[in-house]
Amino acid sequence: MMNVSRPAIHPVDALPVAPTAGAIDRPPVRMKDVQGMPGTTGGLILRLSQFVPALISVSVMVTTSDFRSATAFCCLVLAVSLQSLWSLSLFIIDAYALLVRRSLRNHSVVQCFTIGDGVTSTLTFAAASASAGITVLINDLGQCNVNHCTRFETATAMAFISWFAVSPSFILNFWSLATH
């Protein structure tokens, strides 16, 4: 049997290290923190760039009186609402992690972010594509004077921009899971 000292049996007091003169208290740089990952400044900016176009898209679409006339437009409102809630939630989580200097590199957290980004980006892309198709159809039929084609186009474009901003988050998180 080996004589091994356990901290629970023989506690050892750790003396605090005195800071050196002129040293700045910064958290150490972690090599695996790639900008755009959860808990980084780049991730915070990506979440904001996902949230703002999604919010604009849902706001523009809801202010039209006839968006309920096509299922694709209703689907767009639903998908972009989900995207804006998801992005806002993760923006708040990223901001909190940056304020308290916590890492969000936990495997379960990154897996949750990856699945959520994948689901919301797929829904947003599908709804934006369907809305673009209906908008083109309305334009080709020459019914833009009756409908709100400009608003439909704006909402669809903002949904595509939001989807485009989700893609780097999803790819970085998926890459992190694959290399873990």
Curated annotation (Swiss-Prot):
It is found in: Cell membrane. It is a multi-pass membrane protein. Residues 63-72, 139-156 are extracellular. GO terms for cellular component: plasma membrane. Residues 1-41, 94-117, 178-180 are cytoplasmic. The keyword Transmembrane helix applies. It comes from the Eukaryota. InterPro entries: CASP_dom (IPR006702), CASPL-5 (IPR045009). Pfam families: CASP_dom. Keywords: Cell membrane, Membrane, Transmembrane, Transmembrane helix. The chain crosses the membrane at residues 42-62, 73-93, 118-138, 157-177. Homodimer and heterodimers. Belongs to the Casparian strip membrane proteins (CASP) family. This is CASP-like protein 5A1. It comes from Arabidopsis thaliana (Mouse-ear cress).
